[in-house]
Amino acid sequence: MAEELVLERCDLELETNGRDHHTADLCREKLVVRRGQPFWLTLHFEGRNYEASVDSLTFSVVTGPAPSQEAGTKARFPLRDAVEEGDWTATVVDQQDCTLSLQLTTPANAPIGLYRLSLEASTGYQGSSFVLGHFILLFNAWCPADAVYLDSEEERQEYVLTQQGFIYQGSAKFIKNIPWNFGQFEDGILDICLILLDVNPKFLKNAGRDCSRRSSPVYVGRVVSGMVNCNDDQGVLLGRWDNNYGDGVSPMSWIGSVDILRRWKNHGCQRVKYGQCWVFAAVACTVLRCLGIPTRVVTNYNSAHDQNSNLLIEYFRNEFGEIQGDKSEMIWNFHCWVESWMTRPDLQPGYEGWQALDPTPQEKSEGTYCCGPVPVRAIKEGDLSTKYDAPFVFAEVNADVVDWIQQDDGSVHKSINRSLIVGLKISTKSVGRDEREDITHTYKYPEGSSEEREAFTRANHLNKLAEKEETGMAMRIRVGQSMNMGSDFDVFAHITNNTAEEYVCRLLLCARTVSYNGILGPECGTKYLLNLNLEPFSEKSVPLCILYEKYRDCLTESNLIKVRALLVEPVINSYLLAERDLYLENPEIKIRILGEPKQKRKLVAEVSLQNPLPVALEGCTFTVEGAGLTEEQKTVEIPDPVEAGEEVKVRMDLLPLHMGLHKLVVNFESDKLKAVKGFRNVIIGPA
């Protein structure tokens, strides 16, 4: 009888598998592979090698605390001669001396997560069991049988592997790109993402069922959407919008997801203070990309928050055009969410592809603060019965806005506001380029088209189908020149009279600081004209000067000012309203890289900024981070005030660990100039 087969060790071939599975950055200490794709391992035996005629090898894999074959979280499979599609299989690749090289293949619909791999070896009546090791299984955008399969290599690189990008802020008229370090392959982030799944309420309620359902990107996406906010659970971020961030970090100060996720884990899964929509979206993007789901951050300008699902935002204003009463239904200057790419076997054909997920806690969905995934295609078609949360997302990009003006005598008049259109310039980063891609057409048909009317009819969007009133008068807000932080500038109410009548009107022109979610701050400029003559077929521009001394103490970190013009013709009771959000441009952060950018060789980043304000800056700090360039955030404090017009400059050491293209992201903070962002692309060559 042959002697017992004894395993000496198992080599999980981290380098080879990491390269083949696009997980090299994750495979430095553990095996991380993607489902539906073979991976390799080598068994080293003592004394003799495996003999097919006398030895039997059976492998087992388990995941989760309560594995079962029925749930798909446990499998036993023998060594086979060939791969069986859709099943766990192990086949021999090579055999030499006392080593056996194997190929293991996982099903393309296996649950993702941490697995234990074991071997049962038997020779005759003798048998032994060995734990070969652990591996983490991810979704696989490279596998055609996987629900997250993307057929474009460029898109797979961008939406799964790229660790840096941009998030778009500002306003629809002045779109501002904010650099962000997603860092999904940075040390410890994958483990944190798995912890996030393991503390979600569905896992705590029924761990076996939760682990089984991790085979579905729809399910995982919905869990992540709920876990990025902390409103119902041990989620990552606490949202705050009142500009009081003293006991945490201002949402505008973050420059990456890595620091946020590490803080959450290091403090026992306690919420991190504070987040707003783009921070929630960016952290969700990091987690989903890390787990293998192609994901991108999306910004919608003039985004509606419709609480009662009537697709209508009604503003009740006083005679000066100021919003009165309940402000819960608002138009946000911009709002960010994520889109993830996946099939939807739970829905009708045609709804695969990009799915919208919104982790910002706004409304409950099935009892939890989460939103989506909902097919972007369903939003475009007005199919509001589609899972999940289609009416809310449809309203964000399509809600109608009605303004009512109430006079002192109690009478209410409908105002015409042509300046506020919901769902503009829906934006995401372009594939492979540091540019913005406009994806509005994926959410909406062209305005006025027959397809748009069909979608609105399907959604029962009666307000949008109604004919718009025309008065022969038009008004819009114009700006004279670029608006830089610290400067004085002019804005104009530009009025056009397209009728043969002469009118004498009242004009109120007002500027107020505003948060990105539409909450107004103090006035920073106003003009009231009681008798404005508008001659037939004429145009007139009325200027308003906005002074730095008026807005400096009340501007939020969003750098936004809302200008409102209300034109009233009292004889015919005509009310015309125009609004525009102005974004004040921060100064440029200049970044120089000193030294030859090579792997594992020290580099120096020289970072500088010129104070654009007419006053000194105090409490100045620079913070930098970049996946592959820094192991953690680096912060330098400036001890002395930076006088008006003066340049402040610091140097920081970097140690790039990985070759290729990286982004160094910088944030500048001070007492009067906050959340100034900058970035520099750095290409690291081989050592």
From Swiss-Prot:
Changing W337F: Reduced isopeptidase and transamidase activities. The modification N6-acetyllysine is found at K468. The active site is at C277, H335, D358. It catalyses: L-glutaminyl-[protein] + L-lysyl-[protein] = [protein]-L-lysyl-N(6)-5-L-glutamyl-[protein] + NH4(+); L-glutaminyl-[protein] + serotonin = 5-serotonyl-L-glutamyl-[protein] + NH4(+); L-glutaminyl-[protein] + dopamine = 5-dopaminyl-L-glutamyl-[protein] + NH4(+); L-glutaminyl-[protein] + histamine = 5-histaminyl-L-glutamyl-[protein] + NH4(+). Monomer. Interacts with phospholipase C; promoting alpha-1 adrenergic receptor signaling. Interacts with PLCD1. GO terms for cellular component: chromatin; collagen-containing extracellular matrix; cytosol; endoplasmic reticulum; extracellular exosome; extracellular matrix; focal adhesion; mitochondrion. Its EC number is 2.3.2.13, 3.4.-.-, 3.5.1.44, 2.3.1.-. This is Protein-glutamine gamma-glutamyltransferase 2. The modification Phosphoserine is found at S60. It comes from the Eukaryota. It is linked to TGM2 constitutes the major autoantigen in celiac disease, a multifactorial chronic disorder of the small intestine caused by intolerance to gluten. Celiac disease is characterized by immune-mediated enteropathy associated with failed intestinal absorption and malnutrition: intestinal inflammation is precipitated by ingestion of the protein gliadin, a component of wheat gluten in the diet. TGM2 is the main target for celiac disease-associated anti-endomysium autoantibodies. The record marks Y516 as: Important for catalytic activity. Induction: By retinoic acid. GO terms for biological process: apoptotic cell clearance; bone development; branching involved in salivary gland morphogenesis; cellular response to cocaine; cellular response to dopamine; cellular response to serotonin; dopamine secretion; gene expression. It is found in: Cytoplasm, Cytosol; Nucleus; Chromosome; Secreted, Extracellular space, Extracellular matrix. Changing V224G: Displays lower Ca(2+)-binding affinity and reduced transglutaminase activity. GO terms for molecular function: calcium ion binding; GTP binding; histone dopaminyltransferase activity; histone serotonyltransferase activity; peptidase activity; peptide histaminyltransferase activity; peptide noradrenalinyltransferase activity; protein-glutamine gamma-glutamyltransferase activity. Calcium-dependent acyltransferase that catalyzes the formation of covalent bonds between peptide-bound glutamine and various primary amines, such as gamma-amino group of peptide-bound lysine, or mono- and polyamines, thereby producing cross-linked or aminated proteins, respectively. Involved in many biological processes, such as bone development, angiogenesis, wound healing, cellular differentiation, chromatin modification and apoptosis. Changing C230A: Does not affect the protein-glutamine deamidase activity.
